[in-house]
Amino acid sequence: MVGNDWVNSYLEAILAAEPGIANSKPPGTGDSKSSLLLRERGHFSPTRYFVEEVITGFDETDLHRSWVQAAATRSPQERNTRLENLCWRIWNLARQKKQVEGKNAKREAKREREREKARREVTAEMSEDFSEGEKADLPGEIPTPSDNNTKGRMSRISSVDVFENWFAQHKEKKLYIVLISLHGLIRGENMELGRDSDTGGQVKYVVELARALGSMPGVYRVDLLTRQVTAPDVDSSYSEPSEMLNPIDTDIEQENGESSGAYIIRIPFGPKDKYVPKELLWPHIPEFVDRALSHIMQISKVLGEQIGGGQQVWPVSIHGHYADAGDSTALLSGALNVPMVFTGHSLGRDKLEQLLKQGRPKEEINSNYKIWRRIEAEELCLDASEIVITSTRQEVDEQWRLYDGFDPVLERKLRARMKRGVSCLGRFMPRMVVIPPGMEFHHIVPHDVDADGDDENPQTADPPIWSEIMRFFSNPRKPMILALARPDPKKNLVTLVKAFGECRPLRELANLTLIMGNRNDIDELSSTNSSVLLSILKLIDKYDLYGQVAMPKHHQQSDVPEIYRLAAKTKGVFINPAFIEPFGLTLIEAGAHGLPTVATINGGPVDIHRVLDNGLLVDPHDQQAIADALLKLVSDRQLWGRCRQNGLNNIHLFSWPEHCKTYLARIASCKQRHPKWQRVEFENSDSDSPSDSLRDINDISLNLKLSLDGEKSGSNNGVDTNLDAEDRAAERKAEVEKAVSTLAQKSKPTEKFDSKMPTLKRRKNIFVISVDCSATSDLLAVVKTVIDAAGRGSSTGFILSTSMTISETHTALLSGGLKPQDFDAVICSSGSELYFTSSGSEDKTALPYTLDADYHSHIEFRWGGESLRKTLIRWISSVEEKKKTKKGEILVEDESSSTNYCLSFKVKDPALMPPMKELRKLMRNQALRCNAVYCQNGARLNVIPVLASRSQALRYLLVRWGIDLSNMVVFVGDSGDTDYEGLLGGIHKTVILKGLASDLREQPGNRSYPMEDVTPLNSPNITEAKECGRDAIKVALEKLGISLLKP
């Protein structure tokens, strides 16, 4: 290429391909929101592709010269106004691209400044010297290659000598492990990899991981939870509720129980009879969580009867894969109180950074990928996970470091303190563990070739797939360059074909085979996939590659090993030229078959190459480098043989048993916090209320002696506001904490506590009132209306769910003429407290509520306590400093409303409060994990444990007391506290009372994504009542199929 001539040739190609470009608008101007790049879903524009080639491939100076040259043409016959205008526009786009790069640099600098500030604040609070023991410990790092020579045979890690040793040490354990992968089409056999962008390497990974874990000694059962798909356009196997995975071949006989092994469990959720992409699954995650929770509870009970001595066998861990499953796993981990493990596979922030650098507007990115919802889910995974498993160090150092919730420097400091037994002051960071994905090599036999490349076993019949590929070639004996990937722009197959077509020596020495999924008709594929295939076909024609390139339309998953063997037989090379490859499982597969590799320098292949040392790394953007690397390997037989041998020698380090041993060792290091209560059957219980089962435990009762006269003299809304009232509230708080402390010291899971079920267990309908009103009087009116509409009876129960404390709730109920006994349970302090109502007590002045102490132990995971409170106080000072208001304090600590698991603050001016996402970001930067909620019309900020919420409290009732969530009806308003969205989705039914709204709708946002990315507003489980009236509520309940008591 020489300067302007090549630029002009590109521009002429653009004009010939799509004349209408001259009338288009650059991205980000006017009404145009189009991108210059290929979209994974959507219309492919050759024009945009060529423009991007120009912008990324040439200096701005060259582009400017092209415009000057076009504008300087004097002859009317030679002058082309369209070319002149086009040159100017593309030059302008190049300048905009530089501006985007500048913005990206500023954003990265701002992120580093914020992170450095957080580090300084944490270091100041931690006076310990961090210098000792802070060097990074990289657990699970891949061992260095050994010098053993296996003479062309791989070392099989699953052989008897190694596996027996592991089996002897772990055979007594009986673990239950849950894996979750929601999107794509998942089945154990004949996986349709490459069918769409959701059914790729992750599907293969999770299925093989489940199968390998199920074959490990000490693991009794593995459940891989995914979505049940009953759509007519997919195979019926994806609608089967369960599928048992065949175990991997081992020479060890293991004891098999009735429910042991590995299973794919398909949970129905989301649109029925429709297969939807992962971007549209977000609103349906709460439904999946509820149904998955019921399944896990059922299996835990079954396993308890088989191997647990009658007590439930809880999962030792729940492992989420990708952001959508990670979001689900965090909620399930909190509901069950078991350790969470997470694997990102592909991370949203990294994708966002790449797309922003390419000049795509944020609105378009979020519209296509739901990127903000995805990123928040990944941040929640960092909050809730004990272990984050990655495939490479690159993922940790360059991708996870982009998140608010992970700082490699701070993580090492906290780990150093933990090793020395020093308190981390309420700060937590998940452990990043590098464990490469595995393969099972027991059945793989590399193709044996002699020094001349001839087959040592000519009598063996060739597999059918060989002839299917060889029919494309005019000279099938030439070495085969093999690429196996979806026809996706990210896989960079177009550049590969260009490199092959433009390198005559390479074309003379080798053939090219492209395995790009399965297809019948190109026009039936997605626009992106079809565009890539059409581009490749045009390049084949352009370079006259007929007889040199194979593009078979169909292959089975079982054919893939044979395809690798064919490439090795011809002394070929496997190539993965993707722009970015998170890991590169196909590179391991190729190495296992004795096939040297050429791979991208971006991502996981770097780590794989460091271990296998069986090929070359190239810049995927450098077409000439790709051609040179391929030519070098196919032309140098000594290099080819050395790379083949290195791969075979070291491939055992990527075996599934090796992966699982490291995996299980890391899981064993997690602190097990399973529920400690004794589960019993309630069906034959005769109790009528929670108080019947709790009445004899006097230590649990909250003997708070209240002055009823004093309470009645308070404000109209039932909440004390004067100084005397605050003093009384502080005294009451101290008495509550003393009662809870006494409970923790004296109460144990006695038979009387657990021998009878709460009344809620036997309710046919349970109505949960979670309406957040601007005034307490409005809330009381709603409560009375709902109770009146639903009716009272033994089959009907009520739960009040609120942000108020128990004493505030009690005072409000009395002021409205309601009795505590009208409710079976009360959820207080935004979900951090759970009480059952009690009808009898020897002390007539005691509050008639019984604290569920097990709930506190259930939600205390990663609770920062006093360190969190100090950080919040500092944050309040910084907010007030930024606002510099003359009105005085914006936010003050409310000790009277705070409890051991809820830090409460009074908001003096809600309009001056920063967005909730700013507070979350601050906490995550400081490694403090919490759930912050703006409530009570914006007048209060409640900060509670990270996995506590009003919606999670309902799931706790299922886990602790076996209460069916589908029997619940949750009443909410048009809007509410900032935890409002969590109350809408799930298998429970929801009634939205129109006309009831909190003024929080005017507050800074709780999220950066729309409500439709959170909850399915068109769900049949959600309906609206036109007004908060008795008749309107009855009509809404009838729509939901709720039968009410007749008056």
UniProtKB/Swiss-Prot annotation:
Tissues and organs where the protein is expressed, per its UniProt entry: Expressed in roots, cauline leaves, flower buds, flowers and anthers. Highly expressed in maturing nectaries.
One of the GO biological process terms: nectar secretion
Superkingdom of origin organism: Eukaryota
Gene: SPS2
GO molecular function, one term: sucrose-phosphate synthase activity
CDD domains with a match to the protein in the record: HAD_SPS
Gene3D superfamilies reported in the protein's UniProt record: Glycogen Phosphorylase B
Pfam family, one: GT-B_Sucrose_synth
Disulfide bond positions: none
PANTHER family: SUCROSE-PHOSPHATE SYNTHASE 2-RELATED, SUCROSE-PHOSPHATE SYNTHASE 3-RELATED
UniProt protein name: Probable sucrose-phosphate synthase 2
Family in the record: Belongs to the glycosyltransferase 1 family.
Subunit-level organization: Homodimer or homotetramer.
UniProt xrefs under SUPFAM superfamilies: HAD-like, UDP-Glycosyltransferase/glycogen phosphorylase
Region (Disordered): 101-153, 712-731
Gene ablation phenotype (knockout): Loss of nectar secretion accompanied by starch accumulation in nectaries.
Pathway membership, UniProt: Glycan biosynthesis; sucrose biosynthesis; sucrose from D-fructose 6-phosphate and UDP-alpha-D-glucose: step 1/2
Assigned EC number: 2.4.1.14
Keywords for the protein's UniProt record, in alphabetical order: Glycosyltransferase, Phosphoprotein, Transferase
Phosphoserine modified-residue sites: 127, 131, 159
NCBIfam families on file: sucrsPsyn_pln
Function: Plays a role in photosynthetic sucrose synthesis by catalyzing the rate-limiting step of sucrose biosynthesis from UDP-glucose and fructose- 6-phosphate. Involved in the regulation of carbon partitioning in the leaves of plants. May regulate the synthesis of sucrose and therefore play a major role as a limiting factor in the export of photoassimilates out of the leaf. Plays a role for sucrose availability that is essential for plant growth and fiber elongation. Required for nectar secretion.
Biased composition (Basic and acidic residues): 101-123
Cell cycle found in the keyword field: no
Organism classification: Eukaryota, Viridiplantae, Streptophyta, Embryophyta, Tracheophyta
Documented activity regulation: Activity is regulated by phosphorylation and moderated by concentration of metabolites and light.
Source organism of this protein record: Arabidopsis thaliana
